[in-house]
Amino acid sequence: SESYPIDCEAFMKDNSGKYVKYLWDPNSYINIMVYNFTTEPNSNSVTLGISHIPFSTTGKHYLEGLGETDYSHLTLANLQFPLCVSINSLYINEESTPTEYSTADIVVTLAHELGHYLGLHHVFAETDNGTCEDTDYCKDTKRYNKQEYDSNCDYIYENEREKYTFKNLVKRTGCDGIEFISYNIMDYAISYSN
């Protein structure tokens, strides 16, 4: 039996084919599902959205970092999982104002998740060992260690509250050691893109 709220990870990873009936033709539409996501009782984080990364055709036009397929045209019959973007309905009305920044801004969340759906990865290094590597497959984007950034933000919040400002929080130290300001929608930490 189905339950509500819905576990977004389980929904997105479901390979039984039972959710494909909710999709429209993936060659003509981007399917966006809006529902209440379950939350872990002891978690301090909230999932605002989640998306599938697209497929790339096998062969000379394959794009690194994407799932490979032999199909150049997907049909619903080719799918066993819900190829879509999922948005947490609890935050559907959240938005920033000219004077107040909201980390749950629906416009930013949707733009970010659509970026994933179209093949973009996070700009920060996503490694289990905390190393600063290029994991977004785009050589021209500045990358940084997000674990280190988050630790620095926590430290500033706890010990130097006067420095906990938007102007300071958009700054990053790149993997090359050079400071830069984040303007990239695929960086879901505080950024001018948001």
Model regions and ranges:
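Metzincin-family zinc-dependent endopeptidase catalytic domain
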Residues: 1-156
